[in-house]
A protein has these predicted regions:
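Short glycine-rich, Thr/Ser-proximal phosphate-binding strand/loop in the N-terminal lobe
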Residues: 4-45, 49, 82-84
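Generic short amphipathic/hydrophobic targeting helices enriched at N-termini
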Residues: 6, 22, 61, 111-117
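Short glycine-aspartate micro-motif
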Residues: 5-9, 64-69
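Hydrophobic alpha-helical segments, especially N-terminal targeting/anchoring helices
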Residues: 20, 76-77
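Short glycine-rich anion-binding loops that position phosphate/pyrophosphate groups of nucleotides
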Residues: 13, 73-76
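Phosphate/pyrophosphate-binding loops at sites that engage ATP/ADP/AMP, CoA/4′-phosphopantetheine
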Residues: 47-67, 108-109
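Glycine-rich phosphate-binding loop and adjoining helix at the ATP-binding site
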Residues: 44-45, 77-124
Length: 124
């Protein structure tokens, strides 16, 4: 059974989410404000809540999700899953986002790529 992926695009204004089928069809999408002035923890909590909402509204579980692809507009350490710096979003300095998300949803792998590649990585 081929599983779906979640794509997350973290931008300066909004964080956009999508559930994507193995054939590239967007099954669900939504967004939430980034609110960078509130600090990265606020945005991370919004990301967690949005993932929970996405999974609930699409009846998704570990049985049909096998990865989350992230896109960030800044310097990323892909190997270690760390956001080194997002120049346009304050507070995102050396944030171990892959580790944070893996602890939140332990059954998926978290991938990090530039914004332009987030959906491609999500379909990997």
């Amino acid at each position: 059974m081929t599983k779906n992926r979640i794509g997350i695009d973290v931008g300066g204004t909004n964080v956009k989410f999508a559930l994507i089928s193995p054939k590239g069809k967007i099954l669900y999408s939504n967004s939430t404000p980034t609110r960078s002035e509130m600090g990265y923890e606020y945005t991370v909590n919004n990301i967690k809540q949005a993932i929970s909402t996405l999974m609930s509204e699409t009846n998704s579980s570990s049985k049909n999700i096998d990865g989350i692809g992230f896109g960030f507009p800044g310097q990323i350490d892909y190997k270690n899953g760390v956001v080194i710096n997002l120049p346009n979003i304050s507070g995102w300095n050396n944030v171990h986002i892959a580790e944070i998300i893996k602890k939140f949803i332990s059954f998926v792998e978290a991938f990090l790529k530039y914004v332009s590649n987030v959906l491609k990585v999500s379909l990997k």
